[in-house]
Amino acid sequence: MLESHLIIYFLLAVIQFLLGIFTNGIIVVVNGIDLIKHRKMAPLDLLLSCLAVSRIFLQLFIFYVNVIVIFFIEFIMCSANCAILLFINELELWLATWLGVFYCAKVASVRHPLFIWLKMRISKLVPWMILGSLLYVSMICVFHSKYAGFMVPYFLRKFFSQNATIQKEDTLAIQIFSFVAEFSVPLLIFLFAVLLLIFSLGRHTRQMRNTVAGSRVPGRGAPISALLSILSFLILYFSHCMIKVFLSSLKFHIRRFIFLFFILVIGIYPSGHSLILILGNPKLKQNAKKFLLHSKCCQ
């Protein structure tokens, strides 16, 4: 018999899972229909679609972890599972990073030759960013697969067993350090791009207030809404990365409040940010409304 707090947690996990599948599915379907109609896809739509697909798989794995935690289902420990998880996790992280870089290059106003060059060519670089991420993540997975025999038992026994001994601690420590370091690279790139974008939007907002003080101008709230959207992206992305680092380096036990809270927060990022993307994109928002209205009519 499940305890009451575990039942509540599982209901929240189900809602989170369904929201993540729905929001990311909307992004994939809308951009897929546009691709079929126009035989081409805009660079931003391509990046959003790839990010949404990776988040769907990430959401599936997070829900699988929740089911394991709640119902104590046996997890199959093998290098294939470790490689798949690492591939999905790293790929989603890099694609989200490139999305932050794309927004920064398109929106921010910085008078620097390198930034101007990036601003003019960012659209053409998007396919290469995606391809480069795929190749890089694949190489990382091959590297870690050699040590999966140590990594997989370590992370699973750390959560599921209180009396576990791990062999070859030196090798394991190197792997954990490299695992955390790999998260740091996209995180630093993302932080630099998004903080630069926030600074640029904040400066633009102050200039508008000084220019049109006391008057109402159409579109005046657009920079503020964009700033809030980017700030929410930053908070979700940063908290997601930090919790992954904590789970990788510290010791927790399942069914404890802190562990359940961390897993729930990890799942908020791929669903919550995709919802923000839909609300901030007129095309995605309109198609999401059409889908909901069509679903109500079919009932």
Curated annotation (Swiss-Prot):
Glycosylation site residues: 163
Spans through the membrane: 10-30, 56-76, 82-102, 125-145, 179-199, 223-243, 258-278
GO molecular-function terms, A-Z: bitter taste receptor activity; G protein-coupled receptor activity; taste receptor activity
Membrane topology, Cytoplasmic segments: 31-55, 103-124, 200-222, 279-299
InterPro entries xrefs: TAS2R (IPR007960)
Chain ranges on the Extracellular side, renumbered to this chain: 1-9, 77-81, 146-178, 244-257
Subcellular location: Membrane
Protein's membrane topology: Multi-pass membrane protein
Cited Gene3D superfamilies: Rhodopsin 7-helix transmembrane proteins
Family per record: Belongs to the G-protein coupled receptor T2R family.
Main function: Receptor that may play a role in the perception of bitterness and is gustducin-linked. May play a role in sensing the chemical composition of the gastrointestinal content. The activity of this receptor may stimulate alpha gustducin, mediate PLC-beta-2 activation and lead to the gating of TRPM5.
Protein name per UniProt: Taste receptor type 2 member 1
